[in-house]
Amino acid sequence: AQPNPPAQTGDDASQTETPDTAPEPAEEPEEPQQEPYVISSPTVDRGTVDGVTYVPWDGVVEHLFFHPIVAYPELAFDGDSQADGIDDWMVTVDEYDKILQSVYDRGYVLVDINDVWSESTDTNGQPVMIRNTLYIPEGKKPLIFSYDDVNYYDYMLKDGFTYKLILGEDGLIWSYGLDPQGNEVISQDLDAVTILDKFVREHPDFSPFGAKGSLSLTGYQGILGYRTNTDTKVWNDELEANRLKECEAVKPIIAELKRTGWTFGSHTWGHINLASSSLDRVKADTKRWMDEVGSLVGPTTILYYPHGARPDGDDVQSTGPIFKYLQEQGFRVFASVGISSYSKIKTDICAVICDRLHPDGTTLRGSDKVIGWYSQFYDARDIIDLDVRPNRGVKWTPKSAS
């Protein structure tokens, strides 16, 4: 766009004709008109709507989780100290795109983890968790997506990931980051959140209830790319002012995510190992998560174990002091990582324990047995991009030899 001409000054300005009537004041720019987004519950038997028949589903609700996805493999897999870890625990944009297409093609539809179980009371008036009957489009299967560490940690900023989520001029969620040449990039094709948003816009039947995914947040380097965290070692008024500014900046992002089917869960404040931490440490960490993260995203009943490490009581019939404390703080669904979408309702306390499957480098490179755990979702041999990943080999049998 051409710049505005400079204002006239001196004699030239005095010769400018004055209009008979004052110009109309400039109008304020209009806020972007957001498309309405409908979120509904799959626990309601809606019968047949618009030619789609909804039928009860009491089987397994599958659950896949992802870490942040690699936008620029040339930065992620550059041979530095982080490269192998990224190769183990992440997928690339291209791999993520293919996974979304595969689960869609295989008849999965997204549901919100918060709709799968509910808190109720038993015949003695004691609180218990119950598994809800879901009503799913006939021929479809329910699927939960969750995303760990959607914080945009400092170390990731130079290793091929996007930097933060932002609101675009259209009112939608976009990602912001720098490409390998250092150019600013605002995109909806480089981040797991925005890619799924776009996929659902293009395939609305993938999310018949409006659900997207559950964002599992720590707090030690802020959330969603905004440095909303405190530091107990070095702090001053300037740092606090910047933190408050970041808190205000992230609020509209949170609101838009919630409006469009995203929910939030805790990944602990400090990504602590709940299997080896003391009760005092868990208490301090949980309070800090509630103060710095929960105060922004709102209450949640979902706890995603860092490292998949299970605290005491992560079995059906016994509960230790750490698990009991976490349940007393409002957590009801406790999610680890495993080889299937296992879930059990605990009998001694009002809680659910469950596992999630993890599409990542370790499972995409895994043995025939490992990739078999994922075969209902995709064929790992079709997903993995060995052209951009480090040359670390695979354990599965090639298709031509299988």
Predicted regions mapped to residue ranges:
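Metal-dependent polysaccharide deacetylase catalytic core of the NodB/CE4 family, i.e.
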Residues: 64-76, 128-129, 136-143, 150-311, ...
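Short amphipathic alpha-helical segments embedded in low-complexity Lys/Glu-rich regions
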Residues: 118-120
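C-terminal active-site subregion of NodB/CE4 polysaccharide deacetylases
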Residues: 31-116, 129-145, 153-157, 275-402
